[in-house]
Amino acid sequence: PKALPFLFLSEMWERFGYYLMIGIFTLYLKDTERGFGLNEAQASDLYGTFIALVFLTPFIGGLLADRVLGYRKSIIIGGILMGLGYILMSIKDLNFLYLSMTLIIMGNGFFKPNISTLLGNVYNEESYKARKDAGYNIFYMGINIGAFVCNFFGAALYNMYGWYAAFWAAGVGMFIGVLVFVIGTKHYKHADQIKPVSETDMPLLKILGTILLPAVIFGLIPLTFETPLVGSKSTDAFLFGCIPVVFFYIHLYRKSPASEKPQIGAMLSIFAVVIAFWAIFKQNGSTMNTW
C-alpha cells in the first residue's frame, strides 16, 4: 500500500531521534564540563525513571487515540512534543532538562503505540491482509535503520560541536518524521478510526480511577520514607505503584470465565517475559554506556 513508505520513514526518523537521545543521555548527565556532573548512581536513577515513564505513557496515549483523538492527530502531537523535548534538552539547565524529559515522555505516549496501530488498520483491508506480516517486517526495518544510523551522527556531532548539536539533530530528525507523516496523510486517512465504546469496554474514567489513580497514590507513599527500601526512592515509588496494577490483573483473571483463563494466563506470562526483556535491553542507555 502507498501508506507504507510514509509510515516507514516516519517511524525511522522517530527512532533516529529517540535512540540518538538515549545513546547520549547518561553521558550528558555525567559530563562534569559540558553536562550536569551527576555521579553514576544519580544518572542511572534519572535514566531509569525516565525509561519507566516512557513505557507507561503509551497505555494512556493509546486509550486517548482510540476513543478521543484518533491516530493521526495523536501521532502528530506526539512527534511535535518529542521534537521539542530533544531540542530543549540541549539547554544546560535542570529546569529545562526536566521539562524536556516530560515532553519526550508525553510525546512517546502519543506517537509510539499509534503509528503501528495505524499501519495495522491499513493492512486490515481485504486486498492487503495477506501481506500484513511482510508490511510489518519492512516497518521494523525502518526502526532498526533509524536506531543504527543515529549513533554515528550523535558521536560525530558531539565530537565536532558538543552535546547541543547532537540533541538538535535528534529534534530535527523527529520533525522530519512528522513532516513525512503529514505529507502522506491522504494514504491512511481512511484507516484513522475512533473506536466506539462497546458495552464490554471499560469506560475511560473508570480505567483512570481504578488503575492509574491508585497507582499514582501508591507511588507517592515511598516519598514519605526517610530511607529508600530498594536502591532509591524512585525505585520504591515504581514498585509501590505497580501494586494496584498487579491486583487489577489478578482480579481480571479471577473474574474471567473459565474458558478464557488459559488465554489470560498465557498473556500474563508473556507480559512477565517482555518486562524482563526490556529491562535488560534498556541497559543500552546506562550500563552499556558505562562499560
Predicted stretch roles:
Residues 77-98:
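C-terminal ends and interior cores of transmembrane alpha-helices
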